[in-house]
Design a protein with these regions (language model features):
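Helix-loop boundary and gating motifs at the non-cytosolic
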Residues: 25-105, 131, 275-315
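Multi-pass alpha-helical transporter architecture, strongest
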Residues: 32, 141-143, 232-244, 433-459
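Substrate-agnostic recognition of the 12-TM MFS/MFS-like secondary transporter fold
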Residues: 57-75, 95-111, 127-131, 159-243, ...
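Structural signature of the two symmetry-related core transmembrane helices
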Residues: 122-138, 340-355
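MFS-fold secondary transporters
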Residues: 137-138, 163, 240, 355-356, ...
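Helix-loop junctions at membrane interfaces in 12-TM secondary transporters
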Residues: 140-158, 357-368
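Flexible cytoplasmic inter-helical loops of multi-pass small-molecule transporters
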Residues: 244-264, 455-459
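C-terminal transmembrane helical hairpin of 12-TM major facilitator-type secondary transporters
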Residues: 340-380
Length: 459
């Protein structure tokens, strides 16, 4: 895959001036990475090779991280694992949301510190290593504590939660660092490349999961999956170590004041951004995929009578869908921005909800997981792209942290609502119907948000 060519952009006196900003065409091939072409002839503060290296390392870091998590796929593996360990419907329902929700909790409270940083990489690397260690600890506990059945469910559930909480301390600085490293128009391609790398690893993860759970079912198998996940997370951290931090053209230093004053000012800061308020509503009503997928693996295996190990097939086909969805997201996001990706993902979610209600065959559910991967990653690329472009640069760290904090409650409320309906009615079909309605409402709200690139093109 050949990504768009990009050159640096400088800013002076609040105006964006284009220093030979040039983007080559986006060509998607089956290879996830290829060299970024370089046509720069003007001198830059940072050599184009540094920008290219950062872009590739950024893609590898995300690909290895999410590829490692694929061995404990939150949408596929974790719900069934929790059920096998005796978890209730309420816990099963939140498993796809627990990691992203935990990630977003701490960001709002550390963003004042992040805004004062002049260099983000030391902060990102420190908390990045700490957030990966819980998977190693969990794997070792599951392997050696064979007689501690009472501890198994808490270990499995708390591992992504603790990892997310620690990661959330660093994610605001990470997002700001990446936003400064990757030019606006190629951000969608960068996010897509990360997801494609993840999906390539995830396809292999599906086969590994099937073999591990076939030959070592239960606790030993779960231990092996946690240790494999940690190995990939460590590769992710090493990839990030090779990135060279770029200084910002503008650096915002917030006025000195008490921490309480900072917290009191947050509601007013968000209220002054009506498009971000709509985006919060879009995110909440766009949780249809996660509401359904919490119980989809259970429904599919119970309906077809297949063993737990066969969920590896679901993981493989979900990641094939992720690759194709990410390729489309890279091309469409490059040309049209993030809004169209979000609309398309919600249309696909409606189709997905209808399909999982009418199919009863293993091949039909396998196809449903392909559609899940395709639509879910259109949504993720679109959300990351649109969010970065809607937030004003001078308060981007704080605003993104606020959006993340609001998203915690969106994730937990939507998935808990699905879990409540499932536990009260026992009907998977009712949960899927609610998710489809949510997606339709989300499309209506999205129509009221103008695409930022269209506005900048007119101005």
């Amino acid at each position: 895959m050949i990504f768009p060519v990009f050159h640096r952009k400088t800013e002076t006196q609040g105006q964006n001036k284009d220093d030979s900003l040039s983007f080559g065409p986006l060509r998607a091939t089956m290879a996830p990475f290829a060299m970024l072409s370089d046509t720069a002839h003007q001198p830059h503060a940072h050599h184009p090779q540094v920008v290219r290296r950062n872009f590739i390392c950024h893609c590898l870091e995300g690909g290895f991280y999410m590829g490692g998590v694929a061995f404990l796929q939150p949408e596929t593996v974790m719900p069934k694992m929790v059920e096998q360990l005796g978890g209730r419907s309420a816990i099963i329902a939140i498993m796809p949301a627990i990691l992203p929700a935990a990630f977003a909790m701490a960001g709002l409270f550390v963003s004042p510190l992040v805004e004062k940083l002049t260099r983000f990489k030391p902060w990102v690397m420190t908390f990045g290593l700490l957030q990966r260690l819980p998977y190693l600890v969990a794997g070792l506990l599951l392997w050696f504590m064979q007689d501690a059945e009472a501890w198994l469910l808490p270990v499995v559930v708390l591992t992504p939660f603790i990892s997310g909480l620690i990661g959330g301390i660093g994610v605001v600085a990470w997002m700001e660092m990446v936003t400064r490293m990757v030019p606006e128009r190629v951000r969608a391609a960068g996010w897509a490349a990360r997801y494609i790398t993840q999906a390539c690893i995830g396809m292999g993860a599906g086969a590994v999961i099937q073999q591990v759970l076939t030959h070592a079912p239960g606790q030993r198998g779960y231990a092996v999956l946690h240790l494999i996940a940690f190995a990939f997370l460590l590769l992710s951290w090493i990839s990030q170590a090779f990135m060279r931090e770029l200084t910002a053209a503008h650096h915002y230093h917030p006025p000195t004041g008490s921490y309480w004053r900072y917290l009191k000012g947050l509601p007013g800061l968000l209220a002054a951004q009506p498009r971000l308020l709509r985006l919060i509503a879009v995110r909440f009503t766009g949780m249809g995929y996660l509401m359904v997928v919490s119980f989809l693996t259970l429904h599919a295996l119970h309906t077809t009578g297949r063993p737990e190990a066969d969920e590896g097939h679901f993981v493989t086909f979900q990641n094939i869908g992720t690759i194709l969805g990410s390729l489309l997201a890279a091309w469409l996001g490059y040309h049209s921005g993030g809004k169209v990706l979000l609309i398309l993902s919600r249309v696909i979610c409606v189709v997905f909800c209808v399909w999982v209600c009418v199919t009863h065959s293993f091949s039909g559910f396998t196809a449903a997981y392909f559609v899940l991967g395709f639509g879910l990653f259109l949504d993720r690329v679109g959300d990351l792209t649109l969010t970065a472009e809607l937030c004003p640069p001078e308060r981007r760290s704080t605003l993104q942290a606020m959006l993340g904090f609001c998203n915690v409650w969106s994730l937990l409320l939507a998935t808990s609502l699905g879990g409540l309906i499932y536990s009260m009615s026992g009907s998977f079909y009712l949960v899927a119907s609610l998710a489809a309605v949510f997606s339709l409402v989300s499309i209506l709200i999205l129509r009221g948000i103008a695409e930022p690139r269209g506005e900048s093109g007119k101005s």
